Each structure stands twice: as C-alpha cells, then as structure tokens.
Amino acid sequence: MADDGHEMTDGGHDHAGVEFEGADAPTVALDVTADPAGGINVFVETTNYVVAAESASTEHVEGEGHFHLYIDGEKVLRFYNEAVYFGGVTEGDVEVMVELSANDHSTYTLGGEPIVAMTTFTVPAHSHDDHSHGDPEPVVFEGDAPTLEVTVEPDPKSGYNAFITLDGMVLSAENASGDHVAGEGHLHIYVNGQKLGRLYGPATHIPVLPDGDVEIRVAAYTNDHMVYVDGAGDPIEASTTVEVG
C-alpha cells in the first residue's frame, strides 16, 4: 500500500521571526531519502530544542516549538516528529527546507536569520503506481500485540492535532517501504475511512476535517505496508470520533 501524493498539506506562510535570546541557540540539520514506494522521507536532528506538539498554536516559550516543511519555497506541512513522509514530489531536483517554528508559529531567528536546514534533493524516477490496489494482506504480529490509543484535539490556530500512544512496536522510519522486520513498522492515519497519511511518531497535525461526526483511525502497518493483526486476526488499530462544526 503506497501513500497518496499530497497528504496532510498545510500550505501558506506564518508569522514573522522571533529572535532566540538564550545562550544555547537551537540547531537543526536534515537528511532526505527517496522512499521506495514513491515520495521522500525527511529526517531531522536538532539540539537545544524541544518539540512540543501539545503546545502548538499557543504562547511562545523559548526553546519550544515544532517544524515546518517547505518544498521549493512553499510551506507544505507542520510536523511534530523527527521523521516525516511527504509524497507530493515528482522526479527531478527539489529544494527541501525545515524551519524551526515557535509554539505561536513565529520562525526562530538567530542574528536576524531564520534557523533552518536546507538541501537540494534529486527525486528519482518512480515507475509504478504509487496508489494502493485493494486491501493489503494482514500480517500477524509476533508475540504480544502492541497497544494503540489515539486522541484528537482542536488546534488553537487551525485544524486538529492527533496524539497517539503506542506500546510494544518499533516505529522505523528508516525502513519504511523496505523489507518486513517483525515488530517494526509505521502507522497509517484515516479520516472517515480515507487514508490521510503515514506516521512515524506520536503526534500529527490535521489541517482540516469535514463537518459532522468524524472518525479518526490509526492503524499499525509493517515496513512494507501490510496491516498488522493480532492473534485473533483483528487489526491493531485505535479510533476516536470528533464532532466538527
């Protein structure tokens, strides 16, 4: 099962910069790899920086914040994990930039310059269809099945934030779309049964939801995108319903 091309996009530009005033300024570095199923995986490393998903869109606290992902100068995602998948790229050179954002979405600056990491990545040709065809085959999780919970809260600025608790499974962004390794994998998130994205960590921003009672479901998948099931054959997943509007 491959990912849709433009998942969880969060375009536009946010607030002006906020100068970091402390002695130990944050740093950010990034690495980009081609995902075997299409798209790219972006890996982020920081120092002196706390990703605070629960404080997103609230008052500025120095040293806290989240990430913004830009592709060719356009903001496409707000994200909270140190690895993120993005499918909305095509073959050729793309400029990938990760920006350190404060809780209130101001860009962190140092000496007046934004604190960012940037690289140009050549997206390889991808010859087969990136979209899924039918349901993936289930894989029985070896040993005790992991536990999975999800809660969803309105974001004070826009959209919603989903918070996931997972115990007993290794989230392995570096092996996504690779060979199956027992106990490893990633998560898929769904809105009313429609796949929204692939997750490598415990929190994600959902830019918009339809009005009404909306089901948010998170499910565990193998590295090669097969659904994990427990010994009884039931999918390892969690869901919650959000009233929107």
Labelled PLM ranges:
Residues 12-24, 133-144:
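Proline/serine/threonine-rich low-complexity linkers at boundaries of modular beta-sandwich domains
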Residues 26-28, 36-42, 146-148, 156-162:
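Structural beta-strand segments of beta-rich domains
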Residues 46-58, 166-178:
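Short amphipathic, basic-aromatic surface patches that mediate peripheral association
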Residues 67-69, 187-189:
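Short beta-strand elements bearing conserved aromatic residues within extracellular beta-rich modules
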Residues 74-81, 194-201:
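Short beta-strand segments within Ig-like beta-sandwich modules, predominantly Fibronectin type-III
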Residues 86-90, 206-210:
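Short, flexible loop/turn segments at beta-strand junctions in immunoglobulin-like
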Residues 101-109, 221-229:
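Short acidic/polar inter-strand loop motif in beta-rich domains
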